[in-house]
């Protein structure tokens, strides 16, 4: 058996190959020495997670409620929603053909809308569609399983149970949803809460009702009939589900007295991200396979997300495929055989010009995210068009001001599978009864938050306010809004 060998002297041969191209790549007064590390110091700080106090409303299914953002901390870094999902039991007296499960992406779809407000004026918002898109294109594979566990994609919740079976655990199941507001993207854009003493800051939630989140099916209803059944209490459930404890947690940074004194001394502009969702529109491949949808966004758009949602079951919010999920015993297949992307190709038009002409869905689902997103979605039907070289980067790397464009429209050409499934002729379970669809498009845009305080450290709290630039629909005077 031979012995492996090497010696230090041979390395000098490599060093001796230094020539003209190496002069271009190596050396000089600004060259980095990789073997003498320079410490990059930071200011002194600590982090503290705290629950936020309830402000208005009742945190329950189908309700609107809010929490107040505390100013006890200096910078708000991240927030997340923690919910206890109750155990649900399907009525044991029902026929064995019935099954019950929670919708996929439960924590996403619990949120009809979430907003952050300054003195009741909305600074940022998102909905369940943005949560679906954002997680699909930004959560890396190394965190995907953990994220699925946090938002409810676990077998005890999304796998169907027969009559007498229980969804969830005794005492409920605790789920967590990271809230993707602009300040959570990076510590450099954290919200300086200590510099905003005269702003009433709130996070507001609009929750869906439990009837919109539970999926009841009856396999005795065979094609062409839909297997989905509206839930009735006490016929299907003996009691209506009630949420357990609901909390919003915030992670704050506490800084030194010196840094705190400087926070409000000068005007500070923060480049933030906002979300716009166009009104959903019916998508009917049988009658119009190439519909044209007007999209009216504004500001510097850095990315467009779009999909055709399968709404055959009103409670299946995160299905963007041609087929409905298929239940077999105690399992569910969310992408059954014969399930495809409802969109074959897409045309983007503005200024009477084809910005993108009949680009195949593989471009929006694979190629564009491969180059411009942190990850490629693992499920069918998610589409991205990024104006930015890397839309997840906070720095400006490309955008288009939709406020300056006219007659913007998108034409999603239906795939043959969508046409067949719409008529119930898909040929496989899940598409052998008529499927219905709607078109969803979401934009991420940049905007600027201006935070301004007093002129001196002694009175920096006296004049703090937040200004949102270029938000014309919120304007009080001209192109800006001021939150005093």
Swiss-Prot record:
Alphabetic keyword roster: Capsid protein, Late protein, Virion
Intracellular or extracellular location(s): Virion
Family annotation (Pfam families): Capsid_N, Capsid_NCLDV
SUPFAM superfamilies (UniProt xref): Group II dsDNA viruses VP (SSF49749)
Gene Ontology molecular function terms on file: structural molecule activity
GO cellular component: viral capsid
Gene3D superfamilies for the chain: Adenovirus Type 2 Hexon, domain 4, Major capsid protein Vp54
This protein's record includes keyword Kinase: no
Family named by the database record: Belongs to the NCLDV major capsid protein family.
Physiological role: Major capsid protein that self assembles to form an icosahedral capsid. Represents around 50% of the total virion protein mass.
Quaternary data: Homotrimer.
Listed name of the protein: Major capsid protein
Gene source species: Wiseana iridescent virus
